[in-house]
Amino acid sequence: STERSWVSRGAHKLIGALDAFDVSPEGRRCLDAGASTGGFTEVLLDRGAHEIVAADVGYGQLAWSLRSDDRVIVMERTNVRELTAEAIGGPVDLVVADLSFISLATVLPALTACASSQADIVPMVKPQFEVGKERVGAGGVVSDPELRADAVLTVARRAAELGWHAVDVTASP
């Protein structure tokens, strides 16, 4: 069979996580924090999400096919640190996040504020934004396995402080 063409490679990252964690967006209201071109949003739609709030600090990045879908609420020029359930039209049942140039640990309180009490969160941890600039190697890569693990633990601890329970961790494909 032929491989589906997605709007971005981000789609493969979310597919891997949803499958690894057995999380289904079907029938759920979702928040895609850091939507960019919409790879995560496209997967959520493909897997039956009822509605997706696609939030990003950028402007004009979301693919037209997603922007024009009635199930997608586009929130551009939006700092996800300032999101609230009220700002996005009510709480969501699933939060997915693929953020750059910001620590996920600092954004988790806002993502939590947007989530219903029964929500799931599937965040993409990027070590280069969690460990501090002084610990990031050439090209913005954190290659030390201990530092990478520390980044995941930092985010997991912050999530636990906010009432989340880490189910599992998986590497991005």
Task: Please provide the spans of the model-predicted regions.
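Conserved class I S-adenosyl-L-methionine
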Residues: E26-S36, L44
